[in-house]
Amino acid sequence: MAMTVEEMVEWYKNNSDWSNKEKYKSKIASDLELLTALNPFLEKGYSLIAAAEHDVVYFGVLLEALAKADDELIKDILSDSGVFIEEGTDSLGMFV
């Protein structure tokens, strides 16, 4: 059963192991069912897999922004982490 965004935010807050970032990053990247469950909540269809692979810390903060439905904050977080939003598409790009 898919979780709501709020439930996902809570789950990641309670299960975060920021001392072992690589292990946690791998967990998020491999948890496609959970990531896929987020997609219906994203008004513009942003891809969270790219964000999770880029930086797990920003992914966690992004989940919190999603729970608050703060679109400008989401854009700021993604921009700060080197991810740019292609308006009118369902994908993210990465700055190289």
Give names to the regions the model predicted:
Residues 1-47:
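Long, contiguous N-terminal structural blocks used for assembly/anchoring
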Residues 38, 57-59, 92-94:
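Generic structural hydrophobic/aromatic packing signal, biased to beta-strands
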Residues 39-49, 80-87:
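Short secondary-structure junctions
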Residues 47-66:
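Short glycine-rich, basic-tinged beta-strand/loop micro-motifs
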Residues 66-96:
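Short, compact, well-ordered microdomains
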